[in-house]
A protein has these predicted regions:
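Short helix-perturbing small/polar motifs within transmembrane alpha-helices
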Residues: 1-5, 72-110, 162
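Alpha-helical transmembrane segments in multi-pass membrane proteins
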Residues: 1-5, 27, 31, 35, ...
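Hydrophobic transmembrane alpha-helices
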Residues: 1-50
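Generic transmembrane alpha-helix motif of multi-pass integral membrane proteins
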Residues: 27-43, 54, 58-59, 77-86
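Short, charged juxtamembrane terminal tails flanking transmembrane helices
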Residues: 169-179
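Interfacial aromatic-anchored transmembrane helix boundaries in multi-pass membrane proteins
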Residues: 12-21, 55-84
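Membrane-embedded alpha-helical hairpins and interfacial helices in multi-pass inner-membrane proteins
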Residues: 96-170
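Hydrophobic alpha-helical transmembrane segments
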Residues: 25-26, 48-53, 68-69, 95-99, ...
Protein backbone atom coordinates (compact mmCIF):
# COMPACT_ATOMS: atom_id res chain seq x y z
CA UNK A 1 0.00 0.00 0.00
CA UNK A 2 2.88 2.34 0.73
CA UNK A 3 4.26 1.76 -2.77
CA UNK A 4 0.84 2.53 -4.32
CA UNK A 5 0.65 5.71 -2.26
CA UNK A 6 4.14 6.79 -3.32
CA UNK A 7 3.37 6.09 -6.99
CA UNK A 8 0.17 8.14 -6.84
CA UNK A 9 2.02 10.98 -5.11
CA UNK A 10 4.56 11.04 -7.93
CA UNK A 11 1.75 11.28 -10.48
CA UNK A 12 0.08 14.18 -8.65
CA UNK A 13 3.23 16.17 -7.89
CA UNK A 14 3.39 17.72 -11.35
CA UNK A 15 0.56 20.14 -10.58
CA UNK A 16 0.21 22.07 -7.32
CA UNK A 17 -3.61 22.02 -7.39
CA UNK A 18 -3.73 18.27 -7.95
CA UNK A 19 -0.98 17.65 -5.41
CA UNK A 20 -2.42 19.80 -2.64
CA UNK A 21 -6.16 19.58 -3.19
CA UNK A 22 -6.94 16.26 -4.86
CA UNK A 23 -4.09 13.84 -4.16
CA UNK A 24 -4.91 12.82 -0.59
CA UNK A 25 -8.56 12.18 -1.44
CA UNK A 26 -7.75 10.13 -4.52
CA UNK A 27 -5.07 8.18 -2.66
CA UNK A 28 -7.42 7.22 0.19
CA UNK A 29 -10.10 6.32 -2.36
CA UNK A 30 -7.72 3.96 -4.16
CA UNK A 31 -6.22 2.55 -0.95
CA UNK A 32 -9.56 2.19 0.86
CA UNK A 33 -10.34 -1.25 -0.57
CA UNK A 34 -6.78 -2.44 0.07
CA UNK A 35 -6.92 -1.18 3.68
CA UNK A 36 -10.32 -2.83 4.20
CA UNK A 37 -8.94 -6.11 2.84
CA UNK A 38 -5.88 -5.84 5.10
CA UNK A 39 -8.01 -5.33 8.20
CA UNK A 40 -10.51 -8.05 7.27
CA UNK A 41 -7.95 -10.61 6.10
CA UNK A 42 -5.49 -10.23 8.98
CA UNK A 43 -8.39 -9.96 11.47
CA UNK A 44 -6.10 -9.42 14.45
CA UNK A 45 -5.58 -6.53 16.79
CA UNK A 46 -2.72 -4.32 15.77
CA UNK A 47 -2.90 -4.74 11.97
CA UNK A 48 -4.03 -1.16 11.42
CA UNK A 49 -1.54 0.17 13.96
CA UNK A 50 1.29 -1.81 12.34
CA UNK A 51 0.45 -0.56 8.84
CA UNK A 52 0.05 3.07 9.89
CA UNK A 53 3.25 2.93 11.95
CA UNK A 54 5.07 1.73 8.82
CA UNK A 55 3.63 4.70 6.91
CA UNK A 56 4.92 6.96 9.69
CA UNK A 57 8.37 5.35 9.48
CA UNK A 58 8.49 6.04 5.74
CA UNK A 59 7.69 9.69 6.43
CA UNK A 60 10.30 9.71 9.22
CA UNK A 61 12.90 8.39 6.78
CA UNK A 62 12.04 11.24 4.41
CA UNK A 63 12.67 13.83 7.12
CA UNK A 64 9.13 14.37 8.39
CA UNK A 65 9.73 13.16 11.95
CA UNK A 66 6.48 14.65 13.27
CA UNK A 67 4.40 12.27 11.12
CA UNK A 68 5.55 9.12 12.94
CA UNK A 69 3.74 10.02 16.20
CA UNK A 70 0.80 11.27 14.11
CA UNK A 71 0.41 7.96 12.30
CA UNK A 72 0.86 5.98 15.52
CA UNK A 73 -1.98 8.07 16.99
CA UNK A 74 -4.14 7.47 13.90
CA UNK A 75 -3.37 3.75 14.17
CA UNK A 76 -4.43 3.72 17.82
CA UNK A 77 -7.68 5.51 16.95
CA UNK A 78 -8.40 2.94 14.23
CA UNK A 79 -7.56 0.10 16.62
CA UNK A 80 -10.01 1.57 19.15
CA UNK A 81 -12.71 1.49 16.46
CA UNK A 82 -11.89 -2.16 15.71
CA UNK A 83 -11.29 -3.21 19.33
CA UNK A 84 -14.23 -5.52 20.04
CA UNK A 85 -13.85 -9.18 19.15
CA UNK A 86 -14.95 -9.88 15.60
CA UNK A 87 -14.99 -6.20 14.69
CA UNK A 88 -12.54 -6.82 11.86
CA UNK A 89 -15.30 -8.79 10.14
CA UNK A 90 -17.97 -6.14 10.80
CA UNK A 91 -18.31 -4.08 7.60
CA UNK A 92 -19.46 -0.98 9.52
CA UNK A 93 -16.41 -1.03 11.78
CA UNK A 94 -14.06 -1.64 8.84
CA UNK A 95 -15.65 1.24 6.91
CA UNK A 96 -15.38 3.48 9.99
CA UNK A 97 -11.70 2.61 10.50
CA UNK A 98 -11.00 3.12 6.80
CA UNK A 99 -12.77 6.49 6.84
CA UNK A 100 -10.96 7.71 9.94
CA UNK A 101 -7.59 6.50 8.66
CA UNK A 102 -8.14 8.13 5.28
CA UNK A 103 -9.48 11.39 6.66
CA UNK A 104 -6.68 11.75 9.19
CA UNK A 105 -4.17 11.10 6.43
CA UNK A 106 -4.79 14.77 5.60
CA UNK A 107 -2.66 15.49 8.67
CA UNK A 108 0.40 15.16 6.46
CA UNK A 109 -0.62 18.45 4.87
CA UNK A 110 -2.07 20.24 7.89
CA UNK A 111 0.46 19.51 10.62
CA UNK A 112 3.25 21.72 9.23
CA UNK A 113 0.94 24.76 9.31
CA UNK A 114 -0.59 23.93 12.68
CA UNK A 115 2.59 22.94 14.53
CA UNK A 116 5.45 24.96 13.09
CA UNK A 117 4.69 27.08 10.07
CA UNK A 118 7.61 29.49 10.58
CA UNK A 119 10.15 26.66 10.74
CA UNK A 120 8.58 24.85 7.79
CA UNK A 121 8.50 28.03 5.70
CA UNK A 122 12.11 28.94 6.55
CA UNK A 123 13.32 25.43 5.75
CA UNK A 124 11.34 25.25 2.50
CA UNK A 125 12.66 28.54 1.19
CA UNK A 126 16.26 27.89 2.29
CA UNK A 127 16.18 24.40 0.73
CA UNK A 128 15.28 25.87 -2.64
CA UNK A 129 11.59 25.02 -2.66
CA UNK A 130 9.74 26.80 -5.46
CA UNK A 131 8.09 29.94 -3.96
CA UNK A 132 4.98 29.23 -6.05
CA UNK A 133 4.60 25.88 -4.29
CA UNK A 134 4.92 27.45 -0.84
CA UNK A 135 2.45 30.22 -1.73
CA UNK A 136 -0.05 27.72 -3.15
CA UNK A 137 0.35 25.57 -0.05
CA UNK A 138 -0.41 28.57 2.10
CA UNK A 139 -3.39 29.51 -0.08
CA UNK A 140 -5.04 26.09 0.00
CA UNK A 141 -4.43 25.24 3.65
CA UNK A 142 -5.14 28.60 5.30
CA UNK A 143 -8.15 29.71 3.24
CA UNK A 144 -11.27 28.43 5.07
CA UNK A 145 -13.19 27.74 1.85
CA UNK A 146 -10.37 25.72 0.29
CA UNK A 147 -9.68 23.93 3.55
CA UNK A 148 -13.36 22.98 3.92
CA UNK A 149 -13.41 21.66 0.36
CA UNK A 150 -10.19 19.68 0.82
CA UNK A 151 -11.40 18.12 4.08
CA UNK A 152 -14.88 17.34 2.69
CA UNK A 153 -13.37 15.83 -0.47
CA UNK A 154 -10.94 13.71 1.55
CA UNK A 155 -13.69 12.55 3.92
CA UNK A 156 -15.99 11.63 1.01
CA UNK A 157 -13.20 9.75 -0.75
CA UNK A 158 -12.18 7.91 2.44
CA UNK A 159 -15.77 6.86 3.11
CA UNK A 160 -16.27 5.81 -0.51
CA UNK A 161 -13.03 3.81 -0.48
CA UNK A 162 -14.13 2.01 2.68
CA UNK A 163 -17.57 1.23 1.26
CA UNK A 164 -16.09 -0.04 -2.02
CA UNK A 165 -13.63 -2.17 -0.08
CA UNK A 166 -16.34 -3.62 2.15
CA UNK A 167 -18.55 -4.44 -0.83
CA UNK A 168 -15.69 -6.03 -2.76
CA UNK A 169 -14.85 -8.16 0.26
CA UNK A 170 -18.46 -9.30 0.67
CA UNK A 171 -19.02 -9.89 -3.04
CA UNK A 172 -15.78 -11.61 -3.98
CA UNK A 173 -13.68 -12.74 -1.03
CA UNK A 174 -16.37 -13.95 1.37
CA UNK A 175 -18.35 -15.57 -1.44
CA UNK A 176 -15.23 -17.43 -2.56
CA UNK A 177 -14.60 -18.56 1.02
CA UNK A 178 -11.27 -16.77 1.29
CA UNK A 179 -12.44 -14.79 4.33
Amino acid sequence: MIVIQAALNVIFMFNNFASMVLSTGVIVLVLGPVYALLITRVAKRGASLAYLTMVGIVYLASGNWYLLPWYVLVGLICEAILWRGGSCQDPRKVIAACTVSGFLHQGTNLLPIVLFWDTYYAFSTSAGQDPTYVNDYLLYYTNPAWLAFILAFTLACALTGGVIGSRLIQKHFQKAGVL
